Regions:
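Lipid deacylating catalytic domains
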Residues: 332, 401-404, 459-466
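Proline-aspartate-enriched helix->loop->beta-strand connector
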Residues: 315-333, 340
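PAPS-dependent sulfotransferase catalytic core
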Residues: 370-405
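Active-site rim/loop-helix segments in enzyme catalytic domains that contact anionic ligands
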Residues: 2-321, 344-356, 363-367, 392-396, ...
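Active-site rim elements
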Residues: 228-232, 331-337, 394-403
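Short, catalytically relevant binding-site loops at active-site mouths
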Residues: 333-335, 368-371
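Terminal non-domain segments
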Residues: 357, 362-364, 372-376
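Short His-Asn-centered micro-motif
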Residues: 184-187, 330-331, 338
Length: 467
C-alpha cells in the first residue's frame, strides 16, 4: 500500500469516527431538547462539512514547508517593509525566483482560502495556501523579477499575514526551449498537465506516453458496453489523444509515441521484469492494439507482451533515436502515483543501458501524497511550491511563466482529452456549489474537471537536476 493510500485510509477512518460522534451528539440533543432539532441541524452540518472540511489534507496546516534547493540556487538578501519587497540582487528578469516567508491565517482564513497577492501596478498574481496555514511557505515570483529589481513589487495577504524576515532564492535561467526535449507521460494527458507550455514552445519536442489508461471506464459502460469492451474503447481513445493532442501544440506525429502498456500494471511489471502483466479491466494481454497510431515500429511490437523488459527496450530505442538533451518526467518523491513512480524508474534504468545521456532532468508532480488540491487557488493564478514536510533531496526549482494565450491553448489541449470530458458526479458538483458560495472558491472557466483549475496556471513548475 502506497503512502497516499495509507493516509487516505487513515483519513477515512477518522472521518467515520467523527461522523459517528456527530450523530451521537445529535441524538442526545434530540433527546434532551426538541425532537425536530437534529433533523434541522443535520443538513446544515453536512453543508458545513462539504464547504469547509471535505478537503483531503493529510498534514497539519501549521507545519513548515521544508526545501533544499542545491548548489544551482543561491540566496539573496531581501526585505519586506510595509508590503514592499526589496532586494539588492542583480536580476536579469528570467530567473526562477522563490520567496520563503511565514504565512499565518487570520480567523477568516480558517474558512476562506488564505492567499498572498503579488502586486506590480495593475498586474496582479495571487497564490493560495491551506485554510489555517501557519508556517513557512514558498511563493513563486518567477516572471516578476523586473518589478522586484525596480522596487515596485508589493505583497499583500488576504485572510492571512506575512510574518518574519523573507528569504529570496534565485535559480539562474536555463534556456530549455532551444534544446531537444522528451516528455515522459505515464498516461495520456500527463504531458499536457505538466508541460504543455514547455513542449509547445520547444524547438524540438517528443511526447512519449507509457500506458493506454484504459481502466475506470464507467462513463463508457453507461453507453451500454460491457466492462471489458468499455475499457478497450477508453484505451483506444486515450491512445489517440496521446498522438493527436500534441499536434495542437505543433509537435509532429512523427515525434509522438504511445507504448500501450496497461494502466496501474507498471508496478507488477517492475516486480517481475520478464512476466507479462495483463490489463486489469480490458481482458487483454497484448499491447499492440493501443500502439497502432505510432509512426514507426518499436522492439515490443515483436510479441506485444506487457513486460518490464519490453518497456525498457522500447525506452532505450526511443532515447537512442531522439537523443533528448532534456528529459521531463514525474518527480521520484513528490508524485505518489504508482505508474508515475515506475515511469521515472523505468527511464533511469533504461538510461543505464545506452551510450546517449541527457544533460538535464526536469521533474513534475501532477499528484501529491497529502494535498489533493495543490496547486491551490484558481485557474490563471501563480503556482506556489507544493507542501513538502521533509527536505530529503536537493532539487533546483525551475518555473516557466505562461502568458494568457498559452494558458488558453493549454486549456483547449486538456479539453481534447477524453478522460477529462465526462461530467463530474452529482455529489462533487453539489460540493463545488457549496464551496463557491460558502467558501469563495471559484470554478475554472475552462472546464468542469478539477485538472482545468490545477493545470491552467501562470506557471509550469519543474524540479531540475543536471546529470
Amino acid at each position: 500500500m502506497s503512502r497516499k493510500q495509507q493516509l487516505l485510509k487513515r483519513h477515512r477512518r477518522l472521518k467515520r469516527l467523527g461522523l459517528l460522534a456527530g450523530l451521537l451528539l445529535l441524538l442526545v440533543l434530540g433527546v434532551v431538547s426538541w425532537w425536530w432539532l437534529p433533523l434541522l441541524l443535520l443538513p446544515l452540518v453536512w453543508a458545513a462539512h462539504e464547504a469547509w472540511f471535505a478537503d483531503h489534507l493529510f498534514y497539519s496546516p501549521g507545519e513548515d514547508y521544508q526545501y533544499r534547493f542545491g548548489e544551482q540556487t543561491r540566496e539573496a538578501a531581501t526585505s519586506l517593509s510595509d508590503g514592499l519587497l526589496a532586494t539588492d540582487a542583480q536580476l536579469a528578469g528570467d530567473e526562477t525566483l522563490v520567496l520563503e516567508i511565514r504565512v499565518k491565517s487570520g480567523w477568516l482564513g480558517r474558512f476562506v482560502d488564505p492567499r498572498v497577492e503579488l502586486l506590480d501596478g495593475e498586474q496582479v498574481d495571487q497564490q493560495t495556501f491551506e485554510r489555517g496555514a501557519d508556517g513557512l511557505r514558498f511563493l513563486n515570483l518567477t516572471g516578476l523579477g523586473g518589478a522586484l529589481s525596480a522596487g515596485r513589487l508589493r505583497l499583500r495577504g488576504r485572510y492571512c499575514r506575512l510574518l518574519g524576515a523573507p528569504r529570496l532564492w534565485i535559480t539562474p535561467h536555463s534556456e530549455l526551449r532551444r534544446r531537444r526535449i522528451m516528455v515522459i507521460a505515464p498516461h495520456a494527458d500527463d504531458a499536457e498537465l505538466a508541460a504543455y507550455g514547455l513542449y509547445s514552445q520547444a524547438d524540438e519536442a517528443w511526447v512519449v506516453t507509457l500506458t493506454a489508461g484504459e481502466i475506470e471506464a464507467e462513463h463508457y459502460q453507461q453507453m451500454g458496453l460491457a466492462k471489458a469492451e468499455a475499457a478497450r474503447l477508453k484505451g483506444r481513445l486515450r491512445a489517440w489523444d496521446s498522438i493527436a493532442v500534441p499536434r495542437w501544440a505543433g509537435v509532429p506525429e512523427s515525434r509522438c509515441v504511445q507504448l500501450g502498456y496497461f494502466c496501474l500494471q507498471l508496478p507488477t511489471m517492475q516486480a517481475a521484469p520478464d512476466q507479462p502483466a495483463a490489463s486489469r479491466e480490458a481482458d487483454m494481454a497484448d499491447i499492440r492494439p493501443f500502439r497502432r497510431f505510432n509512426p514507426f515500429p518499436l522492439p515490443a511490437d515483436a510479441d506485444g507482451e506487457p513486460t518490464w523488459n519490453n518497456l525498457l527496450a522500447d525506452l532505450r530505442a526511443l532515447l537512442e533515436m531522439a537523443k533528448p538533451e532534456i528529459l521531463v518526467m514525474p518527480h521520484p518523491t513528490l508524485d505518489p502515483h504508482p505508474d508515475h513512480l515506475c515511469a521515472q524508474a523505468a527511464v533511469l534504468e533504461a538510461l543505464k543501458g545506452i551510450a546517449w545521456q541527457p544533460s538535464t532532468l526536469l521533474c513534475y508532480a501532477n499528484h501529491l501524497h497529502d494535498n489533493d488540491r495543490w496547486p491551490m487557488g484558481d485557474s490563471g493564478d501563480g503556482v506556489a511550491l507544493p507542501p513538502q514536510l521533509s527536505a530529503e533531496q536537493a532539487w533546483a526549482p525551475c518555473s516557466l511563466p505562461l502568458d494568457l494565450p498559452t494558458q488558453r491553448d493549454k486549456a483547449m489541449a486538456l479539453g481534447m482529452m477524453h478522460d477529462l470530458q465526462p461530467p463530474a458526479p452529482f455529489k462533487r458538483r453539489l460540493r463545488r456549489l457549496l464551496q463557491r458560495y460558502l467558501a469563495g472558491r471559484q470554478p475554472s472557466p475552462y472546464g468542469e474537471n478539477e485538472f482545468f483549475r490545477k493545470a491552467v496556471r501562470r506557471h509550469e513548475l519543474f524540479w531540475r537536476r543536471e546529470l
